[in-house]
Amino acid sequence: PPQGVQVSDDRGPIKNGITTAYAEGASLTLTCSATSGKPLARVSWWKGGELITNETQYFPERKRSQSILKIDKLIRSHLLAVFSCEVSNSQLQPPLVVRVAIDMYLRPLEARLQGLNHPLSAGRRTDITCKCKGSRPPAVISWWK
């Protein structure tokens, strides 16, 4: 059977089953590699029980096979989405499975000013609050004059 399974992205090996954070709109390439095994393993990507790709590249000289999952544009629904890499070279044994979740930065969906429901007057104090929602991590709000 295959001995090792490793998932990596453009930044290197994935640790603790979650990618480093990617910006909304960025592209992401995940590579799942299997080493050893005779014959070399078939490698496939799954999400929620559905096959995404089972296109496997074989490198016999290095005793390795791999499959690449490319997401051209990350969207909000990819946040913490779990993708599974399955590695198998025999129907007699269950596949080796490695799961990876996608971490993301999300820009704010909305910024709103509160407290402007009356006319402003010179020399009179008015409190205005800026509320922001939909960002991850929470947005840093600053005021400029």
Walk through the language-model features, giving the residues of each:
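A short beta-strand segment in extracellular, disulfide-stabilized domains
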Residues: A21, S27-A34, R125-C132
